[in-house]
């Protein structure tokens, strides 16, 4: 086993890569273990690509209401679902590459695979068994591979996963998680969004603007329950 890292971080999301960069800037020998995509869920399958989708929806809305702004648009306004999705994935991929650049610039080693803490101070990295989400971002260049790695300190920053509600298990067809909602083959005629947090409202807003009939189901007394009542109203 090579010389131990001062800090080894499991997870290359916003918690992991930011900690890694700061540790390296402070002079610590640092590595990040990632099994799927640098930048984590937020950058690849969360708030970043949803903002790109919402931007397309916003422009579509403005074009359909051009006359409200004293503008004239000839012909019918339409959209290409695959192009809308492709743009959002391109935005995500660009920022994903940016995370890889920042890690390289700050001399943080990137170890590609799935980590297991074997014992205190030792992490085993094996090829990931998790199927990659489609379309996947390319694996960054210059990474380290599977094997055993020693570390004086280990940070676990493994991020978020979709919640599964008993009896409403996702099948990727009729019942989606946010993964499928972000890369639809076509836009559904109707959609029920379970949960009115930030992610739920983002998807509800996007799909409704693009012409889908949307209903939001929330167990708590207000939408956006984690926010101020004034915002929820």
Task: Walk through the language-model features, giving the residues of each.
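Beta1/beta-strand and adjacent pyrophosphate-binding region of the FAD-binding site
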Residues: 2-13, 187-197
């Amino acid at each position: 086993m090579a010389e131990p890292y001062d800090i080894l971080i499991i997870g290359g999301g916003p918690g992991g890569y930011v900690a890694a960069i700061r540790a390296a800037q402070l002079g610590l020998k640092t590595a990040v273990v990632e099994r799927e995509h640098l930048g984590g869920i937020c950058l690849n399958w969360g708030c970043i690509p949803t903002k790109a989708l919402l931007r397309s929806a916003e422009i579509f809305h403005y074009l359909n209401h051009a006359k409200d702004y004293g503008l004239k648009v000839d012909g019918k306004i339409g959209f290409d679902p695959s192009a809308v999705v492709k743009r959002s994935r391109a935005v995500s991929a660009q920022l994903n590459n940016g995370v890889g650049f920042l890690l390289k610039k700050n001399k943080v080693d990137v170890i590609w695979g799935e980590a297991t803490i074997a014992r205190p101070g030792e992490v085993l990295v094996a090829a990931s068994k998790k199927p990659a989400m489609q379309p996947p971002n390319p694996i960054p260049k210059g990474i380290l591979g599977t094997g055993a790695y020693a570390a004086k300190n280990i940070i676990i920053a493994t991020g978020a996963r979709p919640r599964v509600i008993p009896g409403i298990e996702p099948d990727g067809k009729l019942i989606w998680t946010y993964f499928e909602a972000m890369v639809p083959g076509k836009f559904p005629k109707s959609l029920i969004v379970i949960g009115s947090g930030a992610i739920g409202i983002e998807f509800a807003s996007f799909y409704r603007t693009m012409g889908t009939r949307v209903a939001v189901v929330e167990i708590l007394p207000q939408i956006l329950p984690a926010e101020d009542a004034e915002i929820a109203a």
